[in-house]
Amino acid sequence: MKRGEIYFHEYVDNMHRQRRIPVLVVSENVYNGNAPYATVVRLSRYNNNPCPQHVFVPGDAFEQPSQITDSFILCETVSSTKQASLVGPVSFLPDGYHMNKVCDGLKYQMGMIPMEAMRKETDAPAYSAAYRPNGWYSAAHSPQMRATEETEREEE
């Protein structure tokens, strides 16, 4: 597992359904107790995103970010629904820069995932972001976005 690679996080959601969520590895070989973990960015889905087709990520969100500048990530906005598509490449901002100043509503999600729960794929098509594993950190995760997610879950 290397920085900049796209993997799938495989897990079972609270409705006992199998999920495969594409993630971008930003730091590997993180140890939590005895189990190896990887720090990843969630590849989210969006529809009709007004953001530019270039994703800006704060440099302090990554370890040695220059190593993954040709990687791709997905973004979504607070008004997003389940549909989305791949955008990128990644640009890195100065440490501590708040990405909402670049694009209103743009958010990213970071989390730590056990390596054994991740499967390698050569490329990652866009998947639904309606179900998120517990424990994701989401910048700009507003009450409006949470309400949208709850509505989507109720509809399904």
Language model feature labels by segment:
Residues 8, 17-20, 25-61:
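Compact nucleic-acid interaction/catalytic patches
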Residues 62-156:
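C-terminal terminal-subdomain/extension
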